[in-house]
Amino acid sequence: TEKLDYLQDLGIDILWLSPVYKSPFIDQGYDISDYYAIDPLFGTMEDMEELIAEGKKRGISIIMDLVVNHCSSHHEWFQKALADPDGPYADYFYFIESDKEPNNWESYFGGSVWEPVPGTNKYYLHSFHKDQPDLNWQNPVLREEIYKMINWWLDKGIAGFRIDAIINIKKDLEWCSLPSDRDNGLVPVPESLVNAQPIEPFLQELKERTFAKYNAFTVGEVLNETDEELHFFIGKDGVFSSIFDFKQTMLGQEGKGWFDHSLPTADELKESIFQAHERADSIGVQSTIIENHDEPRGVSHYIAEGQVNDTSKKALGTIQILRKGIPFIYQGQEIGMENQVFESVEDFDDIATINGYHVAKEAGLSEEEALAAIAKYSRDNARTPMQWSAEPGLGFSDGSAWLISPKPDVAINVEDQEKDPDSILNYYRQLTALYRHPLYGNTIRFGDMIPAYRERENIIAFERRGDKRLLVISNFQNRQATLELPASIKTVILNNVAGLFQEGDQVLELAPYQTVVLELVE
């Protein structure tokens, strides 16, 4: 709550909280043991109510993470199911009688999705960790419990939810094994979703029983959606207000593990942005990210190695914030936090990262190579404490943090950037201020986005057209570029370097990673 003024100064309208519910924290709180309680690690319910109230005073709405594909194995529902395998709570989950694992599906965190129930001939399903049993959405009693919980939070005053892993609630109830090309014979669980029953009835009912009653804002975590599903998710009568555009985060992920991934190029980033926009623009609103709690730091991922600096960080931020959509800024993004330095696998906390390390080792990589591979992509890169200052504890806490890099770059912190008018933080404030600008706000919030210089290598540029004609150009490379403008410049709205070199009215010479926001003469 004490940081709400900071968020207000940053131009934030909505604050999304990762899970703060009671949890044993096997998976950073995405294993919820009580949906109605705040974990003592974060405070009390009174603290939560104060945050909601103080946020409203500042025009900041609070949304929570809604994790209803699974709960924690510590949740009373699952404990009651284990205590009475034939009782009503067993039907809250997926228990299968079998003398072996029912199929060859592989969980998101590695290994089989099936865990044996000790002392029985049954297995239960977990698409994620074994301590995150999947909830059985086929059961109307379970669905009623979920709707009751959601409405309880909406009654408390939150504005909506970010909806976690929701595509996974649909299942192939035939539990069919699938062809595998892997040495372990397993198939990643997302591939099973192709044969799953329709998800539409579940989500339509979810919306009608909860979100629609409160005009709640919802943003779905949905990957690999089809064009038809896009209409269902965010069309005129879509079940969600928005979904995240993950197309750019999935670039280079065609391999069999993190060790086999490749970092995206500037042109791949550009095309993913434009293709996602062209696919969704006539349908609904996407939410944009360059990083989140499930991704490495964006500046370390999208900017070429050796070229990460304040100028290139501002360039990347400009592209994300000013492209069409709802921009989400992840904590620390606004000060340019980078991937952390991890010296051994023991430094990591994230279960997906540790699994990625073992997958790399099994593929024949050395310890050093496996560590280098997971360090690039680890979710822990974005899960270290927010760097408020350079002092011990980074201004986050006087105590021991749950996760901290052995060598944090303490030079990147809020306190120092507050004092520097040219800092990344103050540049982000200028970016978000454009959404409220009396001349340009409507164009940026609601205007069309039209790709520009699409064929030019390493140039990421687009027009925003509405009340005004704006042009965003980023020379996303480590060398100069010359561009001929489509019209004369009326106003230089924003520039991430000092000065703008022009030859005549319509020719620009851009420095490496120089990024400008221009109003053009119409």
Where are these regions (language model features)?
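Acidic/aromatic-lined carbohydrate-recognition and catalytic surfaces
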Residues: 1-151, 155, 168-226, 235, ...
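Hydrophobic faces of well-ordered beta-strands that scaffold small-molecule active sites
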Residues: 15-17, 62-64, 161, 218-220, ...
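Short glycine/proline-rich turn/loop motifs
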Residues: 123-138, 185-187, 294-301, 405-416
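Active-site regions of oxyanion-processing enzymes, predominantly non-cytosolic
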Residues: 153-165, 286
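Loop/helix patches that line or flank the sugar-binding groove of alpha-linked glycan CAZymes
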Residues: 182-183, 191, 201-203, 207-210, ...
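Beta-strand-rich binding/interaction modules
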Residues: 480-498
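C-terminal beta-strand-rich structural cap/linker in extracellular carbohydrate-active enzymes
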Residues: 504-522
